[in-house]
Amino acid sequence: MFGKQDKMDVRCSTETEANRVSKNGHKEGKDSKGAEGNISTSFLKEQQGTFSASAATEDCNKSKSGSADPDYCRRILVRDAKGSIREIILPKGLDLDRPKRTRTSFTAEQLYRLEMEFQRCQYVVGRERTELARQLNLSETQVKVWFQNRRTKQKKDQGKDSELRSVVSETAATCSVLRLLEQGRLLSPPGLPGLLPPCASGALGSALRGPGLAAGSGTAAAAAAAAAAAPAGGSPHPPSAGTAAGPPPPAALHGAAAAAAGHGLFGLPVPTLLGSVAGRLSSAPLAVAGSLAGNLQELSARYLSSSAFEPYSRTNNKESAEKKALD
């Protein structure tokens, strides 16, 4: 009895121990699971905290980098013309803190020597430039820069002079054209004999002035006409006062026309004009003067129509003058 009871007690004890061990194991498993869960949750919380902190620092750095200037830039304050202060960003490579380079001030002697060398040769290089810089107590760079600036100034002055000369020449040409046009517009038949050769101007002037006025102011013209008429059969003696007072004979005008045969007035046949005048002068002096005036008007019209400055004339009667010249 007692032995069986002991066996049952042992079995019960073993079962109870097994149950107890299983219960303890289950509890330990629960505890371990809870501990693992606590560790994981705490680790996740820590990781989230670290991640959020790192993200915050990155965002802060980004914001700082966005607001701050790069290393190669800097900000300066500048007052504008209106008085307001503005902030501008400039690269540090400008080196604004560096003092400005002073301009080289040449003395009168240095300028004189440099100008003389420039007139001699516009390009001074090599040993000549070194020697010139040593004589003038300057550096070669200063001498080189002075010659460069002097060449630039000379080119600029030459451009201005050429423009001025072109303007002056255009103005002079315009003035000369206008003067010629004015002379052509004011050209009258009595003023045309001044353009004739000397041998023909005396006869035409005496014919235009008439027999009465030729005695007072045309003695030289009458003498020339008599000398021209002498080979035609007249006397070789000089003309007297009586003959000078009267109108010149037709033979004299014929001689003047023959003498003027070698001369051409603007390429126009002058002898035919003088021959027609000489043929009519003996019969009626007034009629001769009228016909001569008509011939001179025709001659002046031909001169104006054949002028080289015809395109510049601003006359409304241009077509009529050309038609008259062609007729």
Swiss-Prot record:
Residues 99-158 bind DNA. PROSITE patterns: HOMEOBOX_1, HOMEOBOX_2. InterPro entries: EMX-VAX-Noto_Homeobox_TFs, HD, Homeobox_CS, Homeodomain-like_sf, HTH_motif. GO terms for cellular component: nucleus. Its main location: nucleus. GO terms for biological process: brain development; central nervous system development; neuron differentiation; regulation of transcription by RNA polymerase II. The keyword Mitochondrion does not apply. Residues 1-34 have a biased composition (Basic and acidic residues). Residues 230-245 have a biased composition (Low complexity). GO terms for molecular function: DNA-binding transcription factor activity, RNA polymerase II-specific; RNA polymerase II cis-regulatory region sequence-specific DNA binding. Keywords: Developmental protein, DNA-binding, Homeobox, Nucleus, Transcription, Transcription regulation. Residues 1-41, 230-249 are annotated as: Disordered. It comes from the Eukaryota. SMART domains: HOX. It is found in: Nucleus. Transcription factor that plays a role in establishing dorsal-ventral polarity in the neural retina. Belongs to the EMX homeobox family. This is Ventral anterior homeobox 1. It comes from Gallus gallus (Chicken).
